[in-house]
A protein has these predicted regions:
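Catalytic cores of the polymerase beta-like nucleotidyltransferase superfamily
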Residues: 1-256
Length: 256
């Protein structure tokens, strides 16, 4: 039986005394967006790579915000906002050369066609997600994220971290772990196998054994991915500054 990383129904809340983050470390524009959305009555957090990297004392390349506000509601709050994307709508808020990406909380995908709205979300016969436009709650947003270390939500107003998946623990142990059942998550999006290698090499993390286990068997699924997306992901793999480690890991996991 495969072991899966399940999420808590309520997050572990880490107060400022329990972590190293300070709001002044983050982009003032991103912090301002969170404050304005919260003041307008929405939930809003800094999320993902910027929180992970800050906990590792790495300077983030960008800052992302997750919110309960829909793209249209976000645009109504910011004159300098533009809605982009078809597969999943995002908002880009421009501050000179800096762009902050704001995403609405996203929900899990129902497993059978009878449960889902085909206009919003669909999968092919192997389980790969084809379209992805289902909004959800904060808890659902955490559930659909790929790795525990990317499922951390930082509130710069209260300076608290919300941790649904023991992500802070995995960061401290330098371990990359998928949320949910690894085989199912790779089938939903085979590119996650390449992302596992990229993050492990970039962050100098080990890949948790249950996360690594299905990769060799499922590697052929990458042939289903559109060549443009695959090319983009391979570029990210080899341009992240860890090409040698990346190549060794790709060969070891039979992805190359």
């Amino acid at each position: 039986k495969r072991r899966t990383q399940q999420l808590r129904s309520t997050p572990e809340v880490l107060n400022s005394s329990q972590h190293s983050l300070q709001r002044a470390q983050f982009s003032r524009y991103a912090v301002n967006i969170v404050e304005r959305l919260q003041n307008a009555g929405y939930q809003a957090y800094l999320v993902g790579g910027c929180v992970r990297d800050m906990l590792l004392n790495i300077t983030p390349k960008d800052f992302d915000v997750a919110t309960s506000a829909t793209p249209e509601q976000v645009r109504a709050e910011f004159r300098n906002a533009r809605i982009i994307g078809r597969r999943f709508k995002l908002v880009h808020i421009h501050f000179g050369r800096e762009i902050i990406e704001v995403a609405t909380f996203r929900a899990n995908h129902p497993q059978n066609d009878e449960e889902e709205d085909s206009n919003q979300s669909s999968r092919n016969e192997s389980g790969r997600i084809l379209r992805d436009n289902v909004y959800g709650t904060l808890e659902e947003d955490a559930q659909r994220r790929d790795f525990t270390v990317n499922a951390l939500y930082y509130d710069p107003v209260s300076e608290r971290i919300l941790d649904y998946a023991n992500g802070v623990h995995d960061i401290r142990n330098r371990l990359l772990r998928l949320i949910g059942d690894p085989q199912q998550r790779y089938q939903e999006d085979p590119v996650r196998m390449l992302r596992a290698v990229r993050f492990a090499a970039k962050l100098n993390f080990g890949i948790e054994k249950h996360t690594a286990e299905p990769i060799r068997e499922l590697a052929p699924m990458l042939r289903e991915i559109p060549s443009a997306r695959l090319f983009e992901e391979v570029l990210k793999l080899f341009l992240s500054g860890n090409a040698s480690d990346t190549f060794e890991m790709l060969v070891d996991l039979e992805l190359f």
